[in-house]
Amino acid sequence: MIIAGFQSGHDVGYCLLKDGVPIIHEELERFIREKEPLGDGLDMLFQRLPDVDLENISHFSYGNPGGMLGKWADRCGKKEPRDKMNKLISQNDGKFFIIGHHQSHAANAFFSSNYDEALIITIDGSGTDKKDWNDVTSEATIDNSFSTAFTFWKGKGLDIEPIERIPMQKITIGSPWRIYTREIFGLSSGHPYGLAAGTVMAMASVGDSEKYWKDFYNSFKAGGGGPSSHTMENCRKYKPIADKSEQDAFDVAAGIQKATEVIAKEIMSPYIEKYNPKHICMSGGVVLNSVMVGKMYDWYPNVEQIYVCPVPYDGGLAIGSAQYVYHQILRNPRVEWKDNTSPYLGNLYTEDDINSALSKYENKIEITDSSDEDVVELLTEQNIISVFGGGSESGRRALGNRSILCDPRSPDMKSIVNEKVKHRQWFRPFAPSILRESVKDWFYKDVDSPYMTTVLDWKEEVKDKVPAVVHLNGTARLQTVTENDNKWYYNFIKRFEDKTGVPIVLNTSFNDREPIVETPEHAINCFMGTNIDYLYFYDLKLLICKKKV
């Protein structure tokens, strides 16, 4: 059984779910090379899969009822599938479903996990849900829907059921964050460069969080989803402060981060105390705040694991809506994941695809047959190496298939990569990819973080061994790696450990101020335009370097 899910508006994309397993998930930004573009996910499906046979797709799902659905006449590629979809939508013969925004987030969080029972929490800026959450066929209207930004669900077996859906008029965290990022710090807050909230989080880690947090707390409580009076007043008050000096900007950022943590804990605690879950599943754009997720282990010591799905922001609505249809509506059994659901859902590129891309640069590059062992050796010689293989990662994080890798033992590597490759601020941290079985030896908490969603404290006695992946406050947003997660990457880190005694490599996304590279040609373009030393196509064992002029 194949179900097609799609997301339109921003974070545009589509997915195909086969027998409950996502087999492909692609986002528009990876192909047009601009972050957070507006568009139509169904049109993207037809453009990317022009030969798709709609008769082979059992059901369609749309996880954003607040988007204008309407007819697809002017938006979908070929006439035949376009006409079929218009007929499906108008007649809705049991094949087309419109799932609530947070309902889709919750489904993605729970059904992507291995838990039979969990408390599900979704947090974002805002999203449209239907008042009757069992209504999965009608479009959202003013009368049948409302906007929420913080919801709680009970997940058990094949079902998720709402416990509480808090209207955004009472609380919203995501919307003020977007406004503060732009208005106070002058950073990008959307298309074409993406939301730079991660930069603000990095700043917050070296600021004084006690100075300003109460004003920002009040703006989150004001809700409303847009530029509320509290939010705009804070912009007017704190922009001049942030402009004074770098440290002042850090202090303002720290206030925003602390306010986020205080209000999130305040809202979550009654539900966690009441239900006392062993497992929490989370989704929604705000849970990309990995600092908050990491602190939840301190707040709630009885919780064994906090699971954040690979695509928690709105790009994951395509996956979540399809999962909801497959499990909760059609009553198909859960999927047992080997350790974790795979985030490597992008297209697989052939040897011909790679050679064709390389041929365009044949006068500028040298190509040699290589091996993983050779690449590990190059890492230990302090080279910066980009890797490309398998399907690209879904989500915001590169997890070994579209990554830039470095030796974490180098005290200079962080500044080198920030300045010469990523072209970003000096204080931005880099993530450690660590063998799952080694986490307990390096961090104070021994938990899973397969999609780089959790910030933890390094153990004092070992952090000096890997200075390139230790943030200024002694933390890291780690990626835990098992052999089932990514066999090639796991074995590569193992080889690095065998040579150095360190089961960790520095991992950052293979890009330079653009979306993560998707195609072989994107990879070569990025490689040629930066100070990356080598590009390694690990499936073919091809090592690329630039010809010396």
Labelled PLM ranges:
Residues 254-278:
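Phosphate/ATP-binding catalytic cores across multiple sugar-kinase/actin-like superfamilies
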Residues 43-58, 267-276:
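Phosphate/pyrophosphate-binding loops at sites that engage ATP/ADP/AMP, CoA/4′-phosphopantetheine
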Residues 54-67, 276-285, 386:
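Short glycine-rich phosphate-binding loop at a beta-alpha junction
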Residues 1-4:
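Extreme N-terminal starter segment of soluble prokaryotic enzymes
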Residues 29-39, 251-254, 258:
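Active-site pocket-shaping loop/turn-to-helix segments
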Residues 51-89, 107-108:
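Short beta-strand-loop/turn "lid" adjacent to the catalytic site in phosphate-handling enzymes
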Residues 202-258:
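Active-site cores of enzymes that catalyze phosphoryl transfer or operate on phosphate-rich substrates
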Residues 7-35, 82-94, 101-107, 111-219, ...:
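Flexible beta->alpha loop and helix N-cap segments adjacent to enzyme active/binding sites
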